[in-house]
């Protein structure tokens, strides 16, 4: 075992006062030579995603002690994307990724911890933990809180997205208030993160693929006993990783990121994975660009039939073999790097050795590579004069991948949603929601409320929506987010005028404002940088520090 970092606070006569304080929190004579392991506990009653995390933290604490480590629990915050969606509060969602990462780094480095076991549930918890691990590079493992089980109504599976879409269905007269209430009461039946292949489940799958959480753990249901057992085993593995000196940057290689992108394409994951993986790679010092997602998309098919665009939820994926089954298919197809290491000290090829080469015959969630849902990945990178740094479109299930239409321009999500619910957005329109980027929002809000309302209105295949903000993992339709440069820093999206012709072409990866160059130059010269919406507080600080979405929207990189 390498020398323990914690010896800086536990060894020598000069550290007697330090030991005195540690004795007050449970250390005994024999404990000062053991590795100190931080357990970053995201427990919160704010959201069902995190409500079960304390039980996992306590199991991990006990397992750490039994394995020969000394656990120290500390709390991290969360912001519920689903609850804050469509409000000013959503501006704090992406910001919380940085706050959580900063908190984990601060606690672990401030207390000279030897390793960290991070437990999270809601969307930003996962990338935040990875950012912190990449910054510190001390042995670490991530424990996902688990997915929620599907709600049931009339024999159909429900997720929280069902409730968002029901709002649009009500406004278009397709359902009444009693039916809306029935969906509301049944959509979220218990603890766990939103149940489709939305952002939380996408990022947990990516972390499992990159080897920083245990096999099968990313698709377990939050309320099933195996979830707590996995938390305990994760603690044991972390103690072993400290002894073997296995560190995050040993695992977060270029090949590991390519594997994560491949799995995300195969399962039909969230657009937010682009932003988060770019941020983690940048922090880890791994060269990765938005163009790499397009390169991998071209060769990796979508083989999982999962919500929001498909039929099944994440517990169904787990029962069909989980992420290891998906990885085995990709590995056998030459689409995965099998030599990447995991926190257990094994290679991916070794981890997958006993996984069947074909998915179970009695399920329809995972398809063989020979019969994919879509021949290419679903996260397309679009470029053009509207997005010189790139934009991201989720095109799985899209019946209209190409649309040229008049721009309907909105300066905020609220303006856009009001127009949709007032039936002021029509088939063929290209909805533009701007000044919602990392700087302009600030915070790059997710546009689930407008997109769900569009679907609920029956316009999901007839309207395109583009934004310098983000989209929820629960979004589907012809939607293009992460448009960069954003409006607030002079991006072309800020020059669009009502009625301009815009082409969104997911097949040719094109996002184009069809206005002649002379007129665009005139508009550019007349453009005035908008005043910051916030000058002080967390959002003011974030807006001053944050990078472009094309670079992961991080706050600690030059």
Curated annotation (Swiss-Prot):
Active site per the UniProt annotation: 472 (proton acceptor)
Residues noted as binding [2Fe-2S] cluster in the record, renumbered to the chain: 49, 122, 194
Record's keyword terms, sorted: 2Fe-2S, Amino-acid biosynthesis, Branched-chain amino acid biosynthesis, Iron, Iron-sulfur, Lyase, Magnesium, Metal-binding
Pfam families listed in its UniProt record: ILV_EDD_C (PF24877), ILVD_EDD_N (PF00920)
Modified residues (N6-carboxylysine): 124
Cofactor requirement: [2Fe-2S] cluster; Mg(2+)
GO BP: any one term: L-valine biosynthetic process
Zinc is among the record's keywords: no
Entry EC number(s): 4.2.1.9
Ranges in coiled-coil conformation: none
Biochemical pathway: Amino-acid biosynthesis; L-isoleucine biosynthesis; L-isoleucine from 2-oxobutanoate: step 3/4; Amino-acid biosynthesis; L-valine biosynthesis; L-valine from pyruvate: step 3/4
Binding annotation for Mg(2+): 81, 123-124, 446
One GO MF term: magnesium ion binding
Cofactor mode of binding and number, as noted: Binds 1 [2Fe-2S] cluster per subunit. This cluster acts as a Lewis acid cofactor.
Quaternary structure and partners: Homodimer.
NCBIfam families, A to Z: ilvD (TIGR00110), PRK00911.1 (NF002068)
Function noted in UniProt: Functions in the biosynthesis of branched-chain amino acids. Catalyzes the dehydration of (2R,3R)-2,3-dihydroxy-3-methylpentanoate (2,3-dihydroxy-3-methylvalerate) into 2-oxo-3-methylpentanoate (2-oxo-3-methylvalerate) and of (2R)-2,3-dihydroxy-3-methylbutanoate (2,3-dihydroxyisovalerate) into 2-oxo-3-methylbutanoate (2-oxoisovalerate), the penultimate precursor to L-isoleucine and L-valine, respectively.
Protein name according to UniProt: Dihydroxy-acid dehydratase
Lineage of the organism: Bacteria, Bacillati, Cyanobacteriota, Cyanophyceae, Synechococcales
Gene: ilvD
């Amino acid at each position: 075992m390498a020398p323990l970092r914690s010896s800086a606070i536990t060894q020598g006569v000069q550290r007697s006062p330090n030991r005195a304080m540690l004795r007050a929190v449970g250390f005994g004579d024999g404990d000062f030579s053991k590795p100190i392991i931080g357990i970053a506990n995201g427990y919160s009653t704010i959201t069902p995603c995190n409500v079960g995390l304390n039980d996992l933290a306590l199991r991990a604490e006990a397992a750490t002690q039994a394995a020969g480590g000394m656990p120290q629990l500390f709390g991290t915050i969360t912001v519920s994307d689903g609850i804050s969606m469509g409000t000013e509060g959503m501006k704090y969602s992406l910001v919380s990724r940085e706050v959580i990462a900063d908190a984990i780094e601060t606690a672990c480095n401030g207390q000279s911890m030897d390793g960290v076991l991070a437990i999270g549930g809601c969307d930003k918890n996962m990338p935040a933990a990875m950012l912190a691990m990449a910054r510190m590079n001390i042995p670490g493992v991530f424990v996902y809180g688990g997915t929620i089980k599907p709600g049931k109504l009339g024999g159909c599976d429900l997720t929280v997205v069902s409730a968002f879409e029901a709002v649009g269905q009500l406004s278009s007269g397709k359902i009444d208030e009693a039916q809306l209430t029935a969906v509301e009461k049944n959509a979220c039946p218990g603890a766990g993160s939103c149940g489709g292949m939305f952002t939380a489940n996408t990022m947990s799958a990516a972390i499992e693929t990159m080897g920083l959480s245990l096999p099968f753990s990313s698709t377990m249901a939050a309320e099933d006993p195996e979830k707590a057992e996995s938390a305990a085993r994760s603690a044991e593995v972390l103690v072993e990783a400290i002894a073997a000196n296995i560190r995050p940057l040993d695992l977060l290689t270029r090949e590991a990121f390519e594997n994560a992108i491949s799995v995300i394409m195969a399962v039909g994951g969230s657009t937010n994975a682009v932003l988060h993986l770019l941020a983690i790679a940048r922090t880890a010092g791994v060269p990765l660009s938005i163009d790499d997602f397009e390169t991998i998309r071209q060769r990796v098919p979508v083989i999982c039939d999962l919500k929001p665009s498909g039929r099944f939820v994440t517990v169904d994926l787990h029962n069909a073999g989980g992420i290891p089954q998906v990885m085995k298919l990709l590995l056998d197809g030459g689409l995965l790097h099998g030599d990447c290491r995991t926190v257990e000290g094994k290679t991916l090829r070794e981890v997958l050795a006993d996984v069947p080469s074909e998915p179970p015959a009695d399920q329809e969630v995972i398809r063989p590579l020979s019969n994919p849902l879509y021949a290419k990945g679903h996260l397309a990178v679009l470029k053009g004069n509207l997005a010189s740094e790139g934009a991201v479109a989720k095109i799985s299930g899209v019946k209209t991948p190409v649309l040229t239409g008049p721009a309907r321009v909105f300066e905020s999500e609220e303006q856009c949603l009001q127009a949709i619910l007032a039936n002021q957005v029509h088939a063929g329109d290209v909805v533009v929601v701007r000044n919602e980027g990392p700087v302009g929002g600030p915070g790059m809000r997710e546009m689930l409320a407008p997109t769900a309302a569009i679907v609920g209105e029956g316009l999901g295949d007839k309207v395109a929506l583009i934004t310098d903000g983000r989209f929820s993992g629960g979004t589907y339709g012809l939607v293009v987010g992460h448009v960069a440069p954003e409006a607030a820093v002079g991006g072309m999206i800020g020059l669009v005028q009502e009625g301009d012709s815009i082409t969104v072409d997911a097949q040719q990866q094109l996002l184009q404002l069809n206005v002649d160059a002379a007129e665009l130059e005139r508009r550019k010269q007349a453009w005035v940088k908008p005043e910051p919406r916030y000058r002080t507080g967390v959002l003011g600080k974030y807006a001053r520090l944050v990078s472009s979405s094309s670079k992961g929207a991080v706050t600690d990189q030059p």
